[in-house]
Regions:
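Von Willebrand factor
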Residues: 1-14
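Active-site-adjacent betaalpha module
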Residues: 3, 17, 21-126
Length: 126
């Protein structure tokens, strides 16, 4: 791949995730650590499900990227929402199913992949 980027979820004490879901993950720096070597590739921070924000879109446009290969955790929320957002912006987004996972099990992962097949096209789930 010519361009590789990472995203990192950062939660806050007053976030919607804490307030409405009582989810306190990723509040601490240790919980937000990227555990593989990023090899100095860009890291974009986010505090919502989607990785799509102005900073990422600016990077995509600056580098003239038209095809995006997406992987990550959790398939049924962050990956799904990011794939939908990129699809709606007109990008060819391929979800690398074997490089995605769900912390709530394989069944939810597979359900998310089925939803993605239906909504962005089965040929984009690889």
């Amino acid at each position: 791949y010519d361009n590789i980027v990472f995203t990192r979820f950062i939660n806050f004490e007053d976030s919607i995730f804490v307030k409405k879901l009582n989810w306190s993950g990723c509040l601490q720096e240790e919980d937000r650590k990227i555990v593989i070597d990023t090899k100095n590739n860009p890291i974009f921070d986010k505090s919502i499900y989607s990785s799509v924000n102005k900073e990422l879109i600016d990077y995509i446009e600056k580098n003239k990227i038209t095809e995006i290969y997406l992987c990550g955790i959790d398939t049924e929320c962050c990956v799904l929402k990011t794939a939908f957002d990129l699809f709606e912006l007109g990008y060819n987004v391929y979800v690398l199913k074997d490089y995605c996972a769900c912390t709530h099990g394989v069944e939810r992962h597979n359900n998310a992949l089925d939803i993605l097949r239906r909504n962005i096209g089965k040929e984009y789930i690889v």
